[in-house]
Amino acid sequence: MLISAMGLSACGGAAAPDVLEQVEIVPKPTFTVGSEVILKASHQPGMQGAKAKIVGAYDTTAYSVTYTPTTGEPPVKGYKWIIQEEIKNHIKQPYNPGTEVVLKADHVKGMLDASGKLDTANTTTVYMIDYTPTTGGGEVKNYKWVTEDEISPVK
């Protein structure tokens, strides 16, 4: 599967249960759990245009981040998205862009414990999804995260 070949941990790895216990569930999101949507996001190959199913909706602040992987690879610029609760020793208030942080997200190999700088901040609803890439391969389960403007209803 292409996603696993890229070193992605779509379920968020070891940090996932801790993060999901801390983030606030949205009681009445625009896209409810179980809804089918079309992805407009292009975070990963095969994502844009894929059908997805909403498996969670959370109220938080989403950040794009530039970070240096712990694997020694070159810096990753503009990675979308990590959330407030995936920042090590996070505070309740949103951070400003430019803030330097340590990541506790484990979305991709080398992300956990990486140092980074927040590029953008957006207080929003984020969604966890299951989807099958348009490029083929198996279903990606519990992918974190897409924002409301990155999905649209199935017509």
PLM features: residue spans?
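A short, structured loop/turn motif at beta-sheet edges
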Residues: 92-94
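Basic/aromatic-rich interaction segments and small domains that mediate binding to polyanionic partners
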Residues: 16-23, 28-29, 33-85, 97-100, ...
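Bacterial signal peptide processing site
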Residues: 12-14
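C-terminal motif of bacterial Sec signal peptides marking the signal peptidase cleavage site
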Residues: 7-10
